[in-house]
């Protein structure tokens, strides 16, 4: 990428931007705020899809359980925000982490 291409890539877009959110919403509260902020900023952001991400800590039994809990939490937040229309654009992410930078993990 040359200097002009980099400057163009870093220029703020005009109007609404399309966005996809990949979130472990059940893990920590920051993701819940991100979902609410994005959906309440519809003059700036066009949320295309939301994906539940895996996580593993004391709140889950493993990455797959963390992803499923995040998926359910996303749907709960969408209901609270009265944005049930986004539930059909919400997907389960992968049940495992990437093994390396070359091997994809299946998801919805």
Question: Where in the sequence are the language-model features?
Answer:
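N-terminal acidic, glycine/proline-rich low-complexity segments
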Residues: 1-108
């Amino acid at each position: 990428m040359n200097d002009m291409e980099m400057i163009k890539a870093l220029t703020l877009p005009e109007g609404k931007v399309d966005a996809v959110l990949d979130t472990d919403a059940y893990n920590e509260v920051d993701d819940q705020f991100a979902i609410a902020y994005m959906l309440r900023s519809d003059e700036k952001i066009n949320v295309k899809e939301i994906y539940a991400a895996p996580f593993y800590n004391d709140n889950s039994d493993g990455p797959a359980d963390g992803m499923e809990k995040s998926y359910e939490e996303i749907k709960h937040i969408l209901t609270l925000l009265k944005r049930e229309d986004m539930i059909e654009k919400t997907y389960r992410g992968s049940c495992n982490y990437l093994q390396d930078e070359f091997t994809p993990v299946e998801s919805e």
